[in-house]
């Protein structure tokens, strides 16, 4: 299973991207966006990860589905982490 794979290999960008596609097909757009962000982060493209996570925040805010609460919390936490990494990355350039 892809979810098990990304837990074991969190830097596997391809697995995250495949998981994103599967989640989109399963009508889980918020989880799909987070998986896409994780794929970007695995490629060290933290700015793109921040962009995807912000899109996820916007989607969560506008979603009538309250079941997305836990995923929204994960997105908020990961966004802070990615913003910090993006800032460090920009400082090194």
Annotate each predicted stretch with a short phrase:
Residues 1-25:
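Alpha-helical adaptor scaffolds
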């Amino acid at each position: 299973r892809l979810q098990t794979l990304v837990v074991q290999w969190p830097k596997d960008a391809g697995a995250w991207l495949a998981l994103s596609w599967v989640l989109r097909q399963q009508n889980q757009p918020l989880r799909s966006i987070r998986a896409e962000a994780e794929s970007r982060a695995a490629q060290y493209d933290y700015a793109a990860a921040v962009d995807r996570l912000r899109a996820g925040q916007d989607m969560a805010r506008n979603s009538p589905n309250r079941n997305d609460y836990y995923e929204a919390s994960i997105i908020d936490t990961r966004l802070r982490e990615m913003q910090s990494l993006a800032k460090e990355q920009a400082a090194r350039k």
